[in-house]
Design a protein with these regions (language model features):
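Extracytoplasmic
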Residues: 67-69, 110, 178
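Glycine-rich, often proline-containing surface loops adjacent to acidic residues and nearby aromatics
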Residues: 105-119
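Acidic, Ser/Thr- and Gly-enriched intrinsically disordered low-complexity segments
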Residues: 7, 62-69, 73, 77, ...
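A generic structural micro-feature
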Residues: 64, 105-107, 171-177
Length: 212
C-alpha cells in the first residue's frame, strides 16, 4: 500500500512522548544527562501536569497553539533510479476467480523529512529538540515496519539544523523560535496496478456454408 511517511513519523513521535510522560522521572535524567536550562523547573512542572497536551502534527498549524509543538513535513522524496525495486513486478495476486487478479508493484524512494520543534523561548526549543531526537531514535525500529504501524523507512539518518525563524504562516503565532531535525531515509512503497483485462464467458458461433 502507498505509505504516508509524515503521518507515520508524527505517530511515532507521539508514541515516544507518551512513553516519556509515563516514565518521566526515569527517562528525563537519562535523556538530558546534565543539560539544564534557566526554565528547567518550569518545563519539568509542565510535563508533570498530565492535562497539558503535546501537539504533534503533520504540517505547520495556522493558529496559535499552546507549547510545545512538533510539526512534521515531507521536504522531498526522490525515486531511486538505480534501485532494485523501480517499477518492478513483485507478484501476481489473484483474488477470487481466475483471471480477475491485479499486479503488485514496488519502488524505492529516498526521502527527506523535516521535524520542526517550536517553542516560546530557546530553552523550550532546545528541550523539545533533544526529546524529539530521542523519540525518533527510540522509534527507529517501529518506523521500519510496514504500514499502518510504520512506513518502511530504512537507512535512517538524523541531523539537526540551527535555530530558525518560524514560517510565514506562523508569523503571528506565539513561537519566535524553531529548531528543525531532518530525517533522511530510504522508503519502500508498494501498490497494486489496474485489474487485468479479461474475457469471460465468450462464445463463438460458426454457421457452416454461410455465403457459399
Amino acid at each position: 500500500m502507498l505509505a504516508m511517511p509524515d503521518k507515520a513519523i508524527a505517530a511515532a513521535i507521539q508514541a515516544a512522548f507518551n512513553q516519556f510522560r509515563q516514565s518521566a522521572a526515569t527517562l528525563a535524567p537519562e535523556i538530558y544527562a546534565q543539560e539544564t536550562t534557566a526554565n528547567q523547573s518550569a518545563i519539568e512542572t509542565w510535563w508533570a501536569n498530565a492535562s497539558n497536551v503535546v501537539t504533534v502534527g503533520v504540517g505547520y498549524p495556522l493558529q496559535q497553539v499552546k507549547p510545545p509543538i512538533v510539526a512534521v513535513t515531507i521536504e522531498a522524496e526522490q525515486e531511486m533510479d538505480r534501485a532494485r525495486f523501480i517499477g518492478s513486478q513483485s507478484g501476481l495476486v489473484v483474488p477470487g476467480a481466475a483471471g480477475t487478479g491485479s499486479y503488485g508493484y514496488a519502488t524505492q524512494l529516498r526521502g527527506r523529512y523535516s521535524i520542526a520543534c517550536l517553542g516560546v523561548n530557546q530553552d523550550w526549543v532546545l528541550w523539545m529538540e533533544v526529546l524529539t531526537r530521542w523519540a525518533l531514535l527510540s522509534q527507529r525500529r517501529n518506523l521500519q515496519q510496514p504500514p499502518p504501524a510504520g512506513a518502511l523507512l530504512y537507512r535512517q539518518t538524523l541531523s539537526a539544523a540551527g535555530f530558525a525563524p518560524v514560517p510565514n504562516s506562523m508569523a503571528d503565532s506565539v513561537y519566535p523560535f524553531a529548531r528543525v531535525l531532518v530525517l533522511e531515509a530510504d522508503r519502500l512503497d508498494t501498490w497494486s496496478g489496474s485489474v487485468a483485462d479479461t474475457v469471460a464467458g465468450a462464445s463463438v458461433s460458426v454457421e457452416v456454408g454461410a455465403g457459399s
